[in-house]
């Protein structure tokens, strides 16, 4: 993932923290939101050169992996300028304004997964249909589906994804008398997050002093929801959050955690959560691929060799983005070629090697190589294989236009009411319901 975390927390805080997770906050001329102050499609770069502008948020890793320089060496007539905005919640409204105006867009615009449904439903005619210019089979089917309009236009090419695993402290498991082998653990909770909760109950019987099984109930909710077939909307864009089987199952698993003693009751990406890694106060966390670097950074040297990675109960996704070409681009042909090249399997593998952004192109998986230090940090776990297995079995989920704020209402209002304030699950659900009705204007 670039460094914008998209799903279940306050966006501003998330994006900034995610950038720290990879340690790759870009240095650039900044406006008031901490991003680049320039925008707009590229013009001539002098002496017949074409300047292509690429609008991104956070850190996509293209510059850091040397991809822009490589492309410009291969195409002497092309100059590339990246316009970066740190925060997604600042970036996307600006993009929408420019799309609606029909001018001022970059030649390539990044689209975060939390915004892709809005782009597909309300801005589809403002983007070029890229499906005519690429072999769509290069990307995961569910990834393409997220960026495809009802009339079949593919408005974005997949960049990274966030396949899920369980990262765990094997030293704490050993002290609690539990198996430490990643394969055995994966078998214990395979197919059901409630089985994961059952392992948590076993852990707490002999938990090392000062430790809990899991960081938060919201962590379990998001991971479980990401593996379900339904979220908050059906495929016809009808709101079904209060009837969704996926929401119900995820909520029940989260409540089993929130009403027990197994949660550290930490809010993800708050400073106390970071401190929890450093102090070793929780034994497991549901971890998408991009969180590997974050855990390594926050746990520090003392965590080396203590962390391990096992397959999650169900395949799930948290994160990912796309590259689209606005119809307002002055250089559509050249922009399409650059977008195709940046998202090709070979280039996605290079970005993974630089900052662990997991590719959305399966043909890249066989050659992926995480950093040697990272592999050792996580007890030589087959990280690439674990995440690849998850990536290829993730269910296709439909994201509605208010998907993100509904999710935040459930995690930051409903679940926290139970976990941190001692409310009953029914009271937490009622609190989330009130917040969601406000979001939906009901």
Task: List PLM regions with ranges.
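Extracytoplasmic/periplasmic substrate-recognition and gating elements
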Residues: 259-260, 297-360
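Short helix-initiation/N-cap motifs at beta->coil->alpha
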Residues: 84-97, 113-114, 188-195, 264-279
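Periplasmic solute-binding protein
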Residues: 120-122, 144-184, 216-236, 318-325, ...
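C-terminal capping/gating helix-and-loop segments adjacent to ligand/active sites or protein-protein/ligand interfaces
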Residues: 378-432
């Amino acid at each position: 993932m670039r460094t914008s975390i998209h799903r279940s927390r306050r966006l501003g805080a998330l994006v900034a923290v995610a950038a720290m997770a990879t340690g790759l906050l870009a240095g650039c001329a900044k406006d008031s939101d901490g991003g680049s102050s320039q925008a707009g499609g590229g013009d001539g770069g002098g002496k017949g050169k074409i300047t292509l502008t690429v609008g991104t948020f956070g850190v996509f890793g293209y510059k850091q992996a040397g991809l822009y320089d490589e492309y410009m060496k291969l195409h002497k007539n092309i100059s590339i300028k990246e316009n970066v905005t740190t925060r997604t919640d600042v970036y996307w409204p600006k993009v929408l304004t420019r799309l609606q105006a029909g001018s001022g867009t970059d030649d390539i615009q990044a689209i975060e997964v939390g915004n892709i449904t809005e782009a597909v439903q309300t801005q589809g005619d403002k983007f070029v249909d890229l499906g005519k210019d690429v072999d769509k089979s290069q990307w995961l089917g569910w990834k393409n589906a997220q960026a495809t309009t009802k009339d079949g236009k593919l408005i974005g090419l997949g960049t990274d994804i966030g396949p899920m695993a369980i990262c765990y402290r094997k030293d704490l498991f050993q002290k609690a008398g539990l198996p430490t082998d990643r394969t055995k653990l994966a078998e214990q909770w395979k197919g059901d997050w409630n089985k994961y909760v059952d392992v948590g109950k076993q852990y707490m019987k002999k938990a090392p002093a000062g430790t809990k099984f899991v960081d938060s109930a919201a962590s379990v909710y998001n991971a479980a929801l990401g593996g379900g077939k339904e979220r908050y909307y059906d495929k016809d864009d009808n709101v079904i959050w209060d009837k969704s089987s996926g929401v119900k199952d995820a909520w029940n698993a989260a409540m089993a955690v929130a009403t027990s003693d197994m949660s550290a009751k930490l809010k993800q990406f708050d400073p106390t959560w970071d401190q929890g890694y450093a102090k070793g106060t929780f034994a497991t966390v549901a971890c998408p691929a991009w969180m590997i670097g974050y855990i390594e950074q926050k746990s520090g040297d003392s965590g080396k060799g203590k962390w391990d990675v096992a397959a999650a109960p169900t395949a799930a996704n948290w994160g990912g983005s796309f590259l689209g070409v606005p119809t307002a681009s002055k250089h559509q042909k050249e922009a399409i070629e650059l977008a195709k090249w940046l998202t090709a399997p070979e280039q996605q593998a290079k970005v993974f090697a630089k900052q662990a952004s997991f590719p959305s192109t399966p043909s890249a998986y066989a050659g992926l190589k995480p950093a040697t230090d990272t592999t050792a940090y996580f007890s030589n776990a087959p990280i690439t294989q674990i995440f690849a297995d998850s990536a290829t079995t993730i269910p296709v989920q439909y994201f509605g236009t208010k998907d993100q704020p509904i999710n935040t209402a459930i995690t930051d209002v409903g679940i926290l009411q139970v976990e941190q304030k001692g409310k009953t699950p029914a009271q937490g659900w009622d609190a989330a319901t009130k917040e969601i009705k406000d979001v939906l204007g009901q």
